[in-house]
Amino acid sequence: MQGSVTEFLKPRLVDIEQISPTHAKVTLEPLERGFGYTLGNALRRILLSSMPGCAVTEVEIDGVLHEYSSKEGVQEDVIEVLLNLKGLAVSVEGKDEATLTLNKSGAGPVTAGDFTHDGDVEIVNPEHVICHLTGDYELVMRVKVERGRGYVPAASRQSADDDERPIGRLLVDASFSPVERIAYSVDAARVEQRTDLDKLVIEMETNGTLDPEEAIRRAATILAEQLDAFVELRDISEPEEKEEKPEFDPILLRPVDDLELTVRSANCLKAEAIQYIGDLVQRTEVELLKTPNLGKKSLTEIKDVLASRGLSLGMRLENWPPASLIDND
């Protein structure tokens, strides 16, 4: 294998050893010396943290109001049931979320295969035990599965959902990554006379929803996309000066005298230190009616004049007043 001394070797996928349906070894070689650790560490981090997948995020169990309780007829307490639900390996096609329902009665184990769902959902580990019923009891459960990435604790979603979340809907820490364990090793490799090359062996275990070869391909794609910015790196030129747009509509910066209100209305506004149209539109009808000597007739006049200019009372203006008005004052 002849080539330029500055030319880098390109690795190839040499072997995929399928140890079990969820456990595989992937070998890539040859790699330049040191690149085994460089690529192995980068791919390991991406495979652990950035692979999209599906996970249980919410659970409703009939008769259960919170996780620190138990359900009559269920051997496990609610917290243990929620932990078992986190082990559910699910894939959802064509949408970002799905709902699984369970209605089981009679003594015996309750497994993932007891859930009912639509055709877009596949439960990869139907034998996974959720809980055990101890007698002739009924267990009714609804589980929400969402698509996501990484690890999202329930506490991070709790504050946003508290006001709308019904009592009894339990939030679950969501680990979306289908990769459960990953390790890599770097061995010596040889190509013709070169013996200083690396061979990268990546060993991974998944929950069965993602093929190991596809996982490597996705991780490499993510890494390449993140490095694109460096490939396209160019000299940073001076940014073009853009014409500054006015922060506010110019009409808001005009004095209220320009509205040509009646003397009574104009005097009432001046008494309240309302100098500019921008000051006026931020007042509400209730606030203006509290102004001495300003009645409903004057209020109607003000509303009509503002409406003719495309304005109204009760408007919100961020960063008002502008610095130019403050300087003038």
Curated annotation (Swiss-Prot):
Q: Which Gene3D superfamilies match?
A: 5' to 3' exonuclease, C-terminal subdomain (1.10.150.20), DNA-directed RNA polymerase, insert domain (2.170.120.12), RNA polymerase, RBP11-like subunit (3.30.1360.10)
Q: A cellular component term (GO) from this record? A: DNA-directed RNA polymerase complex
Give EC number(s), comma-separated: 2.7.7.6
InterPro entries xref list: DNA-dir_RNA_pol_insert (IPR011262), DNA-dir_RNA_pol_RpoA/D/Rpb3 (IPR011263), DNA-dir_RpoA (IPR011773), RBP11-like (IPR036603), RNAP_asu_C (IPR011260), RNApol_insert_sf (IPR036643)
Catalytic function, reaction form: RNA(n) + a ribonucleoside 5'-triphosphate = RNA(n+1) + diphosphate
Q: Where is this region: Alpha N-terminal domain (alpha-NTD)?
A: 1-234
Q: What does this protein do?
A: DNA-dependent RNA polymerase catalyzes the transcription of DNA into RNA using the four ribonucleoside triphosphates as substrates.
**Tell me, how does this one assemble?**
Homodimer. The RNAP catalytic core consists of 2 alpha, 1 beta, 1 beta' and 1 omega subunit. When a sigma factor is associated with the core the holoenzyme is formed, which can initiate transcription.
Read off the domain note: The N-terminal domain is essential for RNAP assembly and basal transcription, whereas the C-terminal domain is involved in interaction with transcriptional regulators and with upstream promoter elements.
Q: What is this protein called?
A: DNA-directed RNA polymerase subunit alpha
Gene name as annotated: rpoA
